[in-house]
Structures are given as structure tokens and as C-alpha cells.
């Protein structure tokens, strides 16, 4: 696996740095100091998923179904269905540099600690980038 040349601190990355990452294909990783925020948010989401209190999008339906509480044994399926409902797109694929930058932007966004993902998701996405495994992303969708 390739090693990164520098760390990104979520919320502190300049536009110039993003442009450099896009144009030069430089590898970057999230600063490990972000892990505490990510872990704290993941614990909150895990507690909400198993708790009795309805939390929108975690253990309730979406949109008009927001008032529908999902049973604890169906929460994982709800989240899987949400991902599958967004797995469609049309148009030509974006170029690889744009797709790579989008992955970096997503990793940086997740590392801010507001999404509730676990740190392992961020590490896995970084590993994929380091190995040159870039998704095909359609222009729309």
C-alpha cells in the first residue's frame, strides 16, 4: 500500500490543498486526532439504534414515514435499504481524478464526527484510495 504524504485535519483543509490533491493525485490521510470525535458520534448512533427513543433516520422511517418507529431487529435492514436506494446513476463516468477527489472529500466529511460512522469506515476508504481502487461515479445520481 502507498503511504500518504500528509495528513488532513477535518474543517481545516484549504481550497488550495484540495486543488493540489485533485491536480497532483497526492495521497493524504485523515489526522488521527479526528478519531475521538468519530468514535463519540458512532457511540451515539449505536445507542440510538438500540434505544427506545425514536431518532429520525436511525430507527424511524424517512420523509412521510418519519413517525414510524422501526423495530430494533429491523434497523440494520433499514440502513441497508437506504444505501441501496441511493445506488443509481446515469451518464458518463466522471474522470478518475474527480472521483478520487470526491472520495477524499467524503472521507474528510465523515472524519468531522457528525455522521456516526465508525473509524474503520474511514480507514477502509483511505486504504482503497491508497491502493488506487476508485469507484466509477456516473455524472448524475
Please report, for each region that a protein language model flagged, where it lies by residue:
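Conserved, well-structured ligand/cofactor-binding cores
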Residues: 1-141
Amino acid at each position: 500500500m502507498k503511504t500518504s504524504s500528509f495528513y488532513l485535519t477535518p474543517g481545516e483543509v484549504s481550497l488550495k490543498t484540495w486543488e493540489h490533491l485533485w491536480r497532483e493525485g497526492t495521497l493524504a490521510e485523515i489526522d488521527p486526532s479526528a478519531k475521538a470525535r468519530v468514535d463519540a458520534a458512532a457511540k451515539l448512533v449505536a445507542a440510538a439504534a438500540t434505544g427506545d427513543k425514536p431518532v429520525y433516520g436511525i430507527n424511524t422511517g424517512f420523509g412521510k414515514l418519519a413517525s414510524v418507529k422501526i423495530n430494533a431487529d429491523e434497523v440494520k435492514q433499514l440502513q441497508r435499504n437506504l444505501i441501496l436506494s441511493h445506488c443509481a446513476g446515469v451518464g458518463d463516468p466522471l474522470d478518475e481524478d474527480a472521483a478520487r477527489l470526491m472520495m477524499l472529500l467524503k472521507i474528510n466529511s465523515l472524519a468531522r464526527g457528525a455522521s456516526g460512522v465508525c473509524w474503520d469506515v474511514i480507514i477502509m476508504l483511505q486504504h482503497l484510495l491508497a491502493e488506487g481502487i476508485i469507484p466509477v461515479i456516473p455524472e448524475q445520481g
